[in-house]
Regions:
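Glycine/alanine-rich phosphate-binding loops at beta-alpha junctions
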Residues: 56-61, 77
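Active-site histidine-anchored catalytic micro-motif
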Residues: 6, 10-13, 79-86, 94-187
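N-terminal amphipathic/basic leader segments beginning at the initiator methionine
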Residues: 1-58
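Charged, often glycine-rich, active-site loop that binds/positions anionic groups
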Residues: 65-86
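Well-ordered alpha-helical segments embedded in enzymatic catalytic cores
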Residues: 51, 84-89
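Flexible, glycine/charged-enriched surface loops at secondary-structure junctions
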Residues: 186-194
């Protein structure tokens, strides 16, 4: 049976001291691509989606794209914008089920009104949808946080190594390589905090 993977992007870098709030228009002005409409050129947090296209095609896998949304760094995301984008992605994931894995492009330093850890919230919902036996992985910026919610929901993640972040394509390729090795049973990644 052909393996099936869902991918999506939801990212920004929040500065909690900034008075400039991010609403839905902030994402639409920077990057908002509906499923299957992301350009071929990868962006900082969307490289897993674009690199995954060739990865899946080469292996004969089905690559189901969800929304890709990025807002330029600013202050808090308003609650309505975060929840609407989160729910859009979750609805797309539900429609794509069953899947063998979820591959995400995240930043890791988002904060929204009412959510200190939006990525942890998103990942928790994703894990609830896919269950414990589906691989969930993501790329992160090195400025990201690693909360307990993220540790519990992720099978593994890869963070950018370079500053400036010129290695986002290579890190997406690393993520997909680890996914390959996990699917083959060669590795069993785990995430921990010490």
């Amino acid at each position: 049976m052909t393996k099936r993977f869902f991918t999506a992007v939801l990212a920004t870098e929040s500065n909690t001291f900034s008075p400039i709030a991010i609403d839905r228009r902030g994402f639409e002005a920077s990057l908002y691509a509906k499923p299957g409409k992301h350009p071929e050129t990868p962006t900082l947090c969307s490289a897993p989606l674009t690199e995954g296209r060739a990865w899946a095609k080469k292996r004969g896998y089905e690559w189901v794209e969800g929304t890709a949304a990025w807002a330029d760094p600013a202050g808090l995301i308003n609650r309505e914008a975060y929840e609407s984008l989160r729910d859009e992605i979750l609805d797309q994931l539900r429609a794509a089920m069953p899947v063998d894995g979820v591959v995400l492009g995240l930043h890791g330093a988002m904060v929204a009104n009412g959510y200190d850890d939006p990525e942890g919230d998103l990942l928790t919902h994703i894990r609830e949808i896919v269950g414990p036996n589906v691989i969930v992985c993501a790329t992160f910026d090195p400025h990201s946080q690693l909360s307990q919610k993220r540790v519990e929901a992720l099978d593994f993640f890869v963070a950018f190594k370079e500053f400036p972040h010129i290695d986002f394509v290579e890190r997406a390729q690393d993520l997909l390589h680890i996914l390959d090795e996990t699917l083959a049973g060669n590795v069993k990644p785990s995430v921990s905090v010490f």
